[in-house]
Regions:
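Signature of N-terminal electron-transfer/Fe-S-associated modules in redox systems
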Residues: 2-167
Length: 167
């Protein structure tokens, strides 16, 4: 029994071994001593103090933790520091699409606001790829973001309004 415990302890110790991780977040370079398997969500929130990215489910199902990795939306709760090495990471704090943020405000999208960072990050990735997204593209791009308050019609209206302004 003691042998199993010591083996478990060694495995646990090896899996939490910290190493130097260099991240490029919102245009700045950060060096952290952290486990490369650590989800970037925890590095952002607990180490760097960038709390705009929210913890929702921890399983990549709700979209509250959506960030951009080299311009693509990813779930920060599932993406490790190691996967982010050498790539550009953008959080809600670094999102510079003011037109999209204005459309969100004009349509009163946020209610409780908890999911909005993830919603905006998914929407920003969509309009970067498709400046005038179709209804189908909006539905597809936003399908991975859950809103407990049910502001889906407002989200769609905000994105449609954004598309009209781009036209």
């Amino acid at each position: 029994m003691a042998e199993v415990l010591s083996t478990t302890a060694v495995i646990k110790e090896a899996s939490t071994a910290a190493s130097t991780q260099t991240l490029f977040i919102n245009g700045k370079s950060f060096t952290l001593d952290a486990d490369p398997k650590m989800p970037i969500l925890w590095a952002l929130r607990d180490i760097l103090g960038l709390t705009g990215t929210k913890y929702g489910c921890g399983a990549g199902l709700c979209g509250a933790c959506t960030v951009h990795l080299d311009g693509q939306p990813v779930r920060a709760c599932l993406t490790s520091l190691g996967q982010a090495q050498g790539k550009q990471l953008t959080t809600i704090e670094g999102l510079d699409n003011q037109k999209l943020k204005n459309a969100w405000a004009e349509h009163n999208v946020p209610q409780c606001g908890y999911c909005q960072a993830g919603q905006l990050m998914s929407a920003a990735a969509l309009v970067a790829q498709h400046p005038k997204p179709s209804e189908e593209q909006i539905n597809s791009a936003m399908s991975g973001n859950i809103c407990r308050c049910g502001t889906y019609p407002r989200i769609k209206a905000a994105l449609q309004n954004y598309a009209k302004q781009e036209g």
